[in-house]
């Protein structure tokens, strides 16, 4: 987090045409998450993957997990000219998870 802010300041102050922002995704429906949920089931924390997924989704005010496409669209935005005056920012894309 602070590394990206320091890099953003350094690039801006040196006049480099480089913007540095950080993307902070929440839980995303990916094979990696499915693997983690399966491990939780195997350890006895949940009876099945569906229950584990629903429980994790319920921790988000939006009551669901992100899709990879949603995170990708956020990354495309911060890399685009639409965010040309954005540097040193933290874009939180977590369905409200950290807002609660």
Which role does the model predict for each range below?
Residues 14-19, 86-88:
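Short, small/polar-rich loop/turn modules that mediate ligand/substrate recognition or access, typified
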Residues 11-16, 28, 66, 79:
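A short hydrophobic alpha-helix cap/turn motif
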Residues 45-50, 60-71, 82:
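A conserved structural motif in NAD(P)-dependent oxidoreductases
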Residues 64, 75-77, 82, 87-100:
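Short C-terminal tail/terminal secondary-structure segment
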Residues 19-29, 79, 92-94:
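Conserved SDR Rossmann-fold cofactor-binding beta-strand/turn motif
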Residues 1-14:
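Conserved catalytic helix of short-chain dehydrogenase/reductases
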């Amino acid at each position: 987090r602070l590394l990206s802010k320091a890099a953003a300041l350094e690039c801006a102050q040196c006049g480099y045409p480089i913007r540095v922002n950080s993307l902070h995704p929440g839980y995303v429906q990916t094979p990696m998450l499915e693997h983690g949920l399966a491990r939780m089931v195997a350890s006895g924390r949940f009876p099945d993957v569906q229950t584990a997924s629903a429980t994790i989704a319920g921790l988000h005010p939006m009551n669901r997990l992100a899709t990879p496409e949603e995170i990708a669209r956020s990354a495309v935005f911060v890399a685009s000219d639409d965010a040309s005056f954005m540097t040193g920012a933290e874009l939180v894309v977590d369905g409200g998870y950290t807002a609660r």
